[in-house]
Amino acid sequence: MDQSSNLTGKMLIAMPGMRDPRFEQSVILICAHSEDGAMGLVVNRPLPEIGFSDLLAQLGIQAGANALDIPVRFGGPVEPGRGFVLHRAPREIELDENRMRITDDLAMSTTRDILEDFARGLGPQPAMLALGYAGWGPGQLDSEIRENGWLTSDRGDEIIFGAEDAGKWRAALKSLGIDPLMLSPDAGHA
């Protein structure tokens, strides 16, 4: 794969007619993309049945009076019991081995210590916690894009970290100048 086709740090926007109901009207941030496959987090599927404070309690983390309440979302169907914190991380901040830099100013963390920081009212902002992730094998994502399953766009932090999950899919399409009502689920290839 050449560097120009690398989608790390980009967003995927599900096309109408997405065959997999787990990804219907999904917006996904691609966290890693290489010849070995791809990994991303769905950013617009809230998990209303579990709040951040509930999750802290389940993990035995005591929330302080100044605890931050970050959104908890369905990140994807792979490893749904594993948490991934997507957060700002300015370039000048050194990341440890359990944190992965996605772009110059965005990282993903999988450590308990970041959850403890949020429980104390610390931690990077904006942030979101995703349970599970979306994964693709070698060439699989590229094939799904060619088959008209996904649109790609530059990252939009207002879409990723914005408050209204229900409108994120439409907002992502509109950021590309696309009216969702004008999209066809069928692709044409010459």
From Swiss-Prot:
It comes from the Bacteria. Disulfide bonds: none annotated. InterPro entries: AlgH-like. Pfam families: DUF179. GO terms for cellular component: cytosol. Belongs to the UPF0301 (AlgH) family. HAMAP family: UPF0301. This is UPF0301 protein Pden_0436. It comes from Paracoccus denitrificans (strain Pd 1222).
